[in-house]
């Protein structure tokens, strides 16, 4: 079973739809309607932390899920979920140099990552965000796996745990190869 933690965002159901085409065994629960014990009792195969408004501190249980469950379950953070991963491990989430809502942008590979396997360098991805993980504050345990031409972090991963984040939206029609990323994550 795949658990999607919903950060009160309409994109959650785009994720649900695309993931359901890969594996229909999905449960969606809002970020303030479950506990760590609930998640452990569910025993999900994967956890996906959805996009959402605001910043990681406003994302219900998400920071604690990352801090406490990162070694127990593979975790993928999308947009706000990605930012939560950066913050949970000690990075700073700051205002992006440019607010980007509904724009396709080129994303360049920066390091090998199992979730970016078979993705071409310079793939198109949908961006909807005004915050980013600050590159200068990235903790030693995380590495950048993709970035923009302006060096904004677009994907990261933990160096020893199965924890991955993408700032862009793989579930968007403006990310033509987004299904590949989700399929790669679900194969872990």
Language-model-derived ranges and their functions:
Residues 44-113, 117, 182-184:
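Cysteine-nucleophile active-site neighborhood
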Residues 173-188:
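Acyltransferase
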Residues 25-31:
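Short hydrophobic/Thr-rich beta-strand motif most characteristic of the beta2 strand and flanking loop
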Residues 1-3:
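Extreme N-terminal starter segment of soluble prokaryotic enzymes
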Residues 16-25:
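Two-component/phosphorelay signaling modules centered on CheY-like receiver
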Residues 113-161:
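Catalytic beta-strand/loop cores that center a nucleophilic Ser/Cys/Thr
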Residues 35-43:
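Short amphipathic alpha-helix with an adjacent loop that forms part of the alpha/beta core around
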